[in-house]
C-alpha cells in the first residue's frame, strides 16, 4: 500500500466512525498533540472527535538522511475522541484491518507506556502498540493538558505512518518507501531532510534563536493577556520549536534546559486556562447535543 493511500484509508475509516477529518496545523510542532485540535479540544466538557495527518519536527532527531528509520521531520496520524468510547481498542484493531493488517494473523501487543509532555503540561496513561515486534502506535487516555484535568477523558491514538508503511511495504528504510506509484519518500523528502539538518546542527545562529525565543515569549504573554487564545498558542508553539532548535545546536545547559521547559509549560497552562474561560463565556456551544457536563 502506498504511503498516501495509508492516509486515505485512515481518513475513510475514522470518517465513518464519526470523526471530523482535518488538515495539518500550519506551525512547526514536535507532535500532533500540539495541534490545537488536540491540545485545546482535549480539555473542557465539550465532546470532540477528530482525525488528521500531522507533519512533525524534532530537530535533534535528524541524521542527514543517513539513518533508515530516524529523521527530524516525519508524519503522524492523530485521532482524538472525547469522551473515549467503549470498544476503542477493537476499533483501532479494525482500523489496522482497513490497512490490510489482519490482527488475527499478526502479533499485536499493547505494552504499558504512560505518556508525558513536560512543555505542554500534559500527560496520560496508555500503551505503545507493537506490531510483530515494532512499535507503530501510541494509545493514550489523556489525564491533563496544559495542567488542566481532562473531564471527560479523551482517547488519543497516534499512528506512526512511516513505520506502518515500512511494515506494509516490507522496507528496511523510510527513504525507500513508495509514496505513490511514481515517487519514493526520498524523492520528496531527502533533500529537505539534508538541508534542514544542516541548519539544525550547523548553520542556525544560537544568538538569534535565543532572541527569537524572547520575542515569541513576549508575544505569547501579550496575547494571553488579551484573551486571544489561538494566536497565543501559535507563539507558544514557536517557543517550543525554538527551544528544540537550540537543543539540537547543543547550546543549552542542563540548568537552561529546565528553565526553558518551565517557561513554555507556564505559557501552555495559561493558554489552556484562557481557552476554558473563552469556551465557558460562549456557554460551551458544542454541548448542545450532549446530555452531560463535566466540570
Curated annotation (Swiss-Prot):
It catalyses: tRNA(Gly) + glycine + ATP = glycyl-tRNA(Gly) + AMP + diphosphate. The keyword Nucleotide-binding applies. GO terms for cellular component: cytosol. SUPFAM superfamilies: Class II aaRS and biotin synthetases (SSF55681). It is an enzyme of class 6 (ligase). Keywords: Aminoacyl-tRNA synthetase, ATP-binding, Cytoplasm, Ligase, Nucleotide-binding, Protein biosynthesis. GO terms for molecular function: ATP binding; glycine-tRNA ligase activity. It is found in: Cytoplasm. GO terms for biological process: glycyl-tRNA aminoacylation. Disulfide bonds: none annotated. The keyword Transcription does not apply. Its EC number is 6.1.1.14. Belongs to the class-II aminoacyl-tRNA synthetase family. PANTHER family: GLYCINE--TRNA LIGASE, CHLOROPLASTIC_MITOCHONDRIAL 2, GLYCYL-TRNA SYNTHETASE. Tetramer of two alpha and two beta subunits. This is Glycine--tRNA ligase alpha subunit. It comes from Prochlorococcus marinus (strain MIT 9215).
Amino acid at each position: 500500500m502506498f504511503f498516501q493511500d495509508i492516509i486515505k484509508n485512515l481518513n475513510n475509516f475514522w470518517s465513518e466512525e464519526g470523526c471530523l477529518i482535518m488538515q495539518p496545523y500550519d506551525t512547526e510542532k514536535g507532535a500532533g498533540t500540539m495541534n490545537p485540535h488536540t491540545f485545546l479540544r482535549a480539555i473542557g466538557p465539550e465532546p470532540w472527535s477528530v482525525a488528521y495527518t500531522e507533519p512533525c519536527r524534532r530537530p535533534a532527531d535528524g541524521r542527514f538522511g543517513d539513518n533508515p528509520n530516524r529523521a527530524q521531520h516525519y508524519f503522524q496520524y492523530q485521532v482524538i475522541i472525547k469522551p473515549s468510547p467503549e470498544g476503542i481498542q477493537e476499533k483501532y484493531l479494525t482500523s489496522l484491518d482497513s490497512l490490510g493488517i489482519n490482527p488475527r494473523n499478526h502479533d499485536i501487543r499493547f505494552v504499558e507506556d504512560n505518556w508525558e509532555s513536560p512543555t505542554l503540561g500534559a500527560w496520560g496513561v496508555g500503551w505503545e502498540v507493537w506490531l510483530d515486534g515494532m512499535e507503530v502506535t501510541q494509545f493514550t487516555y489523556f489525564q491533563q493538558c496544559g495542567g488542566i484535568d481532562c473531564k471527560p477523558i479523551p482517547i488519543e491514538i497516534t499512528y506512526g505512518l512511516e513505520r506502518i508503511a515500512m511494515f506494509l511495504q516490507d522496507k528496511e528504510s523510510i527513504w525507500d518507501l513508495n509514496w505513490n506509484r511514481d515517487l519514493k519518500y526520498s524523492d520528496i523528502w531527502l533533500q529537505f531532510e539534508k538541508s534542514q539538518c544542516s541548519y539544525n546542527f550547523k548553520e542556525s545562529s544560537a544568538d538569534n534563536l535565543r532572541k527569537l525565543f524572547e520575542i515569541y515569549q513576549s508575544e505569547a504573554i501579550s496575547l494571553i493577556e488579551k484573551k486571544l487564545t489561538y494566536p497565543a498558542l501559535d507563539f507558544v508553539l514557536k517557543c517550543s520549536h525554538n527551544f528544540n532548535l537550540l537543543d539540537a545546536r547543543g547550546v543549552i545547559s542542563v540548568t537552561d534546559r529546565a528553565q526553558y521547559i518551565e517557561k513554555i509549560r507556564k505559557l501552555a497552562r495559561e493558554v489552556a486556562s484562557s481557552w476554558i474561560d473563552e469556551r465557558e463565556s460562549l456557554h460551551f456551544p458544542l454541548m448542545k447535543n450532549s446530555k452531560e457536563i463535566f466540570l
